[in-house]
Amino acid sequence: MINLSILISSSEVSGPGGLFDINATLPLVAIQFILLMVTLNIILYSPLLTIIEERKEYVLSHLAQASEKLAQAKELTTQYEQDLETARKEAQLEIANSQNIHKEILDIELDISQKYIDNLLETISSDLLNKKKTALDSLDTIVTSLCTEVETKLSI
């Protein structure tokens, strides 16, 4: 295009308007401006706007997909947390039930052992009492016989 400094220096001031005289140049510049705008719109702006619009649609579609995946991930997370919580509660109940069963088994075994020990002690003590009684009876007979022997020896 024409350099502005050359245009200003080559213009001569003749008449009342000088450089800013309204003659055929202003409509010519306006027509050039409109032609330039139409050309730029056809050549540059339309393809650029279509590319921008395609990019916008691409970003929006991927954003929607990402939002859907995020929602699915949140749903799965809550579902897995609920499953984990129920599994944890079931495990705690299983542990508590197992502990109660083992405690009952231990109590039963302890009772059986205690009864066995009591019966064994009863048997041993009755055996000892019987042996003591027989020993005392035999000692009594021995003492009686010894006493009679001593009496017979003393009376001689």
From Swiss-Prot:
One of its GO terms (cellular component) is chloroplast thylakoid membrane. It is found in: Plastid, Chloroplast thylakoid membrane. It is a single-pass membrane protein. Keywords: ATP synthesis, CF(0), Chloroplast, Hydrogen ion transport, Ion transport, Membrane, Plastid, Thylakoid, Transmembrane, Transmembrane helix, Transport. It comes from the Eukaryota. GO terms for molecular function: proton-transporting ATP synthase activity, rotational mechanism. F-type ATPases have 2 components, F(1) - the catalytic core - and F(0) - the membrane proton channel. F(1) has five subunits: alpha(3), beta(3), gamma(1), delta(1), epsilon(1). F(0) has four main subunits: a(1), b(1), b'(1) and c(10-14). The alpha and beta chains form an alternating ring which encloses part of the gamma chain. F(1) is attached to F(0) by a central stalk formed by the gamma and epsilon chains, while a peripheral stalk is formed by the delta, b and b' chains. Belongs to the ATPase B chain family. HAMAP family: ATP_synth_b_bprime (MF_01398), ATP_synth_bprime (MF_01399). This is ATP synthase subunit b', chloroplastic. It comes from Thalassiosira pseudonana. The gene is atpF2.
